[in-house]
């Protein structure tokens, strides 16, 4: 099965050790970056919830879980021992949801456009093609994260999180009630949860 393919791939790659390579440092650097992003997004989710943005809170939480998986893939290539790295990380504050989205989008942009392509090139140079491929594939996910954050930034800036130009179908995240109109109901008539729980209905199945 697929699991065996991955195990075999890892065995083949790990015939060559990452110990002492630039790739080893890059793996640890990006593991730390993904781990910190996961924590920041968890904090940002709490703020979004408090500010009445249930969908944005859920997206921050979902993205945090995805960063956890990226971190795990990176960590699994490492071989133990202590490794010293020099890297810069956001020593930022927890802001408003708009500020948090902007911070998150900028971080994702840096990863997919600069950091991970660079790490992939180094991995290729050092003879770790599977690690290079991992970085390039994770960069695709990070680009998707950035685009999603930018869409929410636009919604907040144009006050269109719960109101749209034309009629749309809104769905309550709590109970599934469906409503068609330009603006989400102030209160869900079915479960009495506030407007915060409404989002534009998605059909992706």
Each language-model region and where it sits:
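Short, small-residue-biased leader/transition segments that mark boundaries at the very start
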Residues: 1-6
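Non-heme di-metal
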Residues: 10-205
